[in-house]
Amino acid sequence: ENLINDTVKNLSWQDFKIKMSALTNDKVVFLVDELYEYEGITFYGTPWIAPIHWQTWAFEDIQNEYDEYICPYEKIQNCDILITHENPNYNEKLEHYCFGKYKHHFFGHWHDGISYGHLNQYNCSILTDSYLERERPKIVTIELSKNDN
């Protein structure tokens, strides 16, 4: 995460995305408020989190503290897979703006937060709240048909 924090501070979003793609031999597409289609399946990604007042992190939505602004979650489009850093169960704005727009939602940030399988919401964090690797990471298997779109 330090690489991401340092990179975000020094690069534009487009430069950051190009760098992440190069570092992974084009195997990772970093989504910043955008839709991406792969083999007929649509993904929407947004990295923003609400500010954490005791520390500065990459992808904090610092405008979240103001009364009038455009919430980045308003941009979320209909998709098969929604990928967010923030957990919709702990962020009312995310929960509100993503409601009904996805078939499955994968998120992290609240590392020990729970998943709601009956709502197709899955906490996919691979670290615990203590920043230790999980002994048994959660594996989520979903079935999406290209015909579902």
Task: Tell what function each PLM region has.
Residues E1-Y97:
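Conserved catalytic scaffold of divalent metal-dependent phosphoesterases
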Residues N87-N149:
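Conserved beta-sheet core of the metallophosphoesterase superfamily
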